[in-house]
Amino acid sequence: NEYHGFVDKANNENKRKKQQGRDDFVVKPNNFANRRRKDDYNENYYDDVDAADVV
């Protein structure tokens, strides 16, 4: 079934990224911490504080 193939592909990609993140963390923990903070900032970024209150 094509749908399941798509989901499996996405799940595998996520696993790979997580593992890559762990590997990076072991090798260079300081870079990891900085990159993580930047990513969180980008994901939770709102143009306007009010945007966070809109449901």
Curated annotation (Swiss-Prot):
It comes from the Eukaryota. Residues 1-39 are annotated as: Disordered. InterPro entries: Antifungal-protein_dom_sf. One of its GO terms (biological process) is positive regulation of cell population proliferation. Keywords: Antibiotic, Antimicrobial, Fungicide. Residues 1-26 have a biased composition (Basic and acidic residues). Possesses antifungal activity against B.cinerea, M.arachidicola, F.oxysporum, R.solani and C.comatus. This is Cicadin. It comes from Cicada flammata. The lineage of its organism: Eukaryota, Metazoa, Ecdysozoa, Arthropoda, Hexapoda.
